[in-house]
Amino acid sequence: MAFLEVNNICKSFNETEVLKGVSFEMERGEVFSIIGSSGNGKTTLLRCLNFLEIPDSGSITVDGEVIFPATDDQKKKVCPKKRLTFGMVFQNFNLFPQYTALKNVTLAMDVQSENELKAQGVKFLARRAAMKEAHAKNEETAKELLTRVGLENKMYNYPCQLSGGQQQRVAIARALALSPDILCFDEPTSALDPELTGEVLKVIKQLRDEGRTMIIVTHEMEFARNVSDKIIFMADGVIEEMGTPDEIFNAPKSEKTKTFFQKSNEEVKA
């Protein structure tokens, strides 16, 4: 059994079918890149995996546990803990502007600690004392993560004091803070100036080298080729073609895939 099994995921918005039965499997430690033209369901697929959108049908299984069975009751009651299976890095950073880089990373862990204490039935005063200890540990973890992404000298800066590349690295540290099984990136460099793209891609490559399981929606074709175990090409809400980077980039079988690369090459030359 594969580590992640996505089976026949469908999603519509009003009358528009965005995902039309998407299925794939991946093993722990693999990196998949999802490519394709805009408007073909790539971001919606990531949002469904993270339960930011609830699929209309299909199933998602992680490490043998079905975390999304498509029954009517369970579609409406996705356990928040299941969301922690996936971490999400958004293209527009989504940092809290009123908080420092350190607090942006610490905050999610503090919320998780608070929820765990409440679930254990810890009373208010005891919970307050326990949260002081938890916050101290969470802050140390946040400092370690920010150091890992090269921001040890920017921990107390606010987002407005950081470059786009630095903000995205804070967002990556925040996603790692909750120790997700699978880390998802939605076009992590699309909002960056070209000169800042490299610093973010370097961090993602470092995570790959550490054995992180990752799904990356990207328009960076050369990066996808170099960092990925498998490439998924999506078109019209389905997986049109899937294979190794060599298979997809050097010997695509689908006419839609071939056309996509032809247009991409023309845009690069232009």
Question: PLM features: residue spans?
Answer:
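ABC family nucleotide-binding domain
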Residues: 2-4, 10-245
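C-terminal boundary and immediately downstream tail of ABC-type ATPase nucleotide-binding domains
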Residues: 235, 242, 246-270
